[in-house]
Amino acid sequence: MTIELKPGGLLIAIEGIDGAGKTTLARRLTTTLEAAGARVVLSKEPTNGPWGTKLRQSAATGRLSADEEAELLIRDRHEHVDTLIAPALARGDIVILDRYFPSMVAYQGAAGLPLDELLELNAFAPRPDVLLLLDLPPPTGLARIRARGDAPNHFETQDNLERCRTIFAGLELPGKHVVDASADADSVLRQAHAIIVAALADRLSGDGAPADTGKAALELLSAGRPA
């Protein structure tokens, strides 16, 4: 059985400071939901497009100002929404994003740009149905970055990550759920899966689908709950 969520699909954004485990969770959620019959599109920001590539180069070298990075982020996100996110949601897919516009608000905000202006710049971007905020202390995130053999970039200082964490915590967005990312990866996956199943229950009961179809879909998703 293929689980479709028309109209509108389901948009899931995974956020948090560096080292929180966003990429690991995004990949594991995709595998878990696909195994249960969901049609999932996994993506990330910055993307691999021309604007996203410039942004990653900037993260490594620190050559761009906060304003210049913000401009590239918006260009990258416009293209991402138009070419991938909006079409996938229109098909009724589940879209999982490893970072989205809240990261821009947190990181560019930590660099000194006004939060209200950053939110206004992102008004065009579809709001997530589920926003999973992976929260952990910056020293833990930095230790994880070093443990995987990566050298911290200019964003990845304890002071900057503390500022980002504070901004993430203060963002008031619908669908936001705080997940304890200091726990092991299996525990984080279980927390996230339970949140998503609850969101899917709301969507499947309210999108006009036959009751038996929604029930069968939820049974499949619940059966795929991580042990």
Swiss-Prot record:
Residues that, per the record, bind ATP: 16-23
GO biological process terms, semicolon-separated: dTDP biosynthetic process; dTTP biosynthetic process; dUDP biosynthetic process
Annotated EC: 2.7.4.9
Highest taxon listed in the record's lineage: Bacteria
UniProt key word Transferase: yes
Pfam families: Thymidylate_kin
InterPro entries documented for this protein: P-loop_NTPase (IPR027417), Thymidylate_kin-like_dom (IPR039430), Thymidylate_kinase (IPR018094)
Any one Gene Ontology cellular component term annotated for this protein: cytosol
Gene3D superfamilies linked: P-loop containing nucleotide triphosphate hydrolases (3.40.50.300)
Function: Phosphorylation of dTMP to form dTDP in both de novo and salvage pathways of dTTP synthesis.
Similarity comment text for this entry: Belongs to the thymidylate kinase family.
Name of the featured protein: Thymidylate kinase
